[in-house]
Amino acid sequence: GTPCDCYGYTGVYWFMLSRCPSGYGYNLSCHYFMGICCVKR
């Protein structure tokens, strides 16, 4: 995925998803236009 910024963390941008996929250990997310940024901090 594309890197993205979320509260100062670098995350992964998931296109067309409204919530982060499970099983990756994500515990922080930021909503973006047409997708979501998911961060494992």
UniProtKB/Swiss-Prot annotation:
Cystine pairings recorded for this chain: C4-C37, C6-C30, C20-C38
Where can this protein be found?
Answer: Secreted; Nematocyst
Database matches in InterPro entries: BDS_K_chnl_tox (IPR012414), Myo_ane_neurotoxin_sf (IPR023355)
Identify the main location. Answer: secreted
Name one cellular component (GO) term. nematocyst
Q: Which GO-annotated molecular functions does the record name? A: ion channel inhibitor activity; toxin activity
An example Pfam family from this entry, by short name, is Defensin_4
Q: Which domain of life is it from?
A: Eukaryota
Q: What are the alphabetically sorted keywords of the record?
A: Acetylcholine receptor inhibiting toxin, Disulfide bond, Ion channel impairing toxin, Nematocyst, Neurotoxin, Postsynaptic neurotoxin, Proton-gated sodium channel impairing toxin, Secreted, Toxin
**What is known about what this protein does?**
Toxin with different activities on acid-sensing ion channels (ASIC) and nicotinic acetylcholine receptors. Is able to bind T.californica muscle-type nicotinic acetylcholine receptors (nAChR) (alpha-1-beta-1-delta-epsilon (CHRNA1-CHRNB1-CHRND-CHRNE)), and human alpha-7/CHRNA7 nicotinic acetylcholine receptors. Weakly and reversibly inhibits rat homomeric ASIC1 (isoform ASIC1a) (IC(50)=1.25 uM), while it potentiates rat homomeric ASIC3 (EC(50)=1.53 uM). Rat ASIC1a current inhibition is not complete, and reaches a maximum of 86% inhibition.
Family assignment from sequence similarity: Belongs to the sea anemone type 3 (BDS) potassium channel toxin family.
Q: What else is known?
A: A synonymy between H.magnifica and R.crispa is controversial.
Name-wise, this protein is Pi-stichotoxin-Hcr5d
Organism name: Radianthus crispa (Leathery sea anemone)
